[in-house]
Amino acid sequence: MEYIHTTAREDQDRKGLVRTFTGKYVNPLDLNFDDVCIEDIAHHLSNICRFTGAGPFYSVAQHSIQVSWLCRGSRQFALAGLLHDAAEAYLNDLASPVKHAPGMLAYRHAEDEATQVIFGALGVNPEYLEMVKKHDDEMFRNECDWFWGNRVGALHCWTPEQAEKEFLIEYFSLTGVE
């Protein structure tokens, strides 16, 4: 993996673009296949905290791995589970009440579009997303129970570094790509 190094001045000249971990500059509202990089997705999701930080640090990457584990049956289904929140690597995570507010239609559309591009770039069948939703909802209920309910402390939250590593291990084990 070759990382792109730029100066602060070069970064300033790229208004409207987001710099990724690997040094790419992307427009998150207009992603294309060349923008998508699994290392960026893993790194970004491992540094985004679920539940707007209300609980312990628990990354979107760790959540995504656990959803993937629930989506067993086929590699494509598990891969769709792993990548169901991948658009958040470029758009960030929003709390569900905010994301689903009437005024957030443009965000939801951007997230859907980014998901389609990511799935296309990584060869994942987007038809699995509806089935993944059931397991995502199940994981949400488990997470609430682990952090604030009857099973507080039952989940060991990973560091961002561990979550990133585990995310990439899961991705490469499902795709057979190294």
Please report, for each region that a protein language model flagged, where it lies by residue.
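Metal-dependent phosphohydrolase cores
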Residues: 1-178
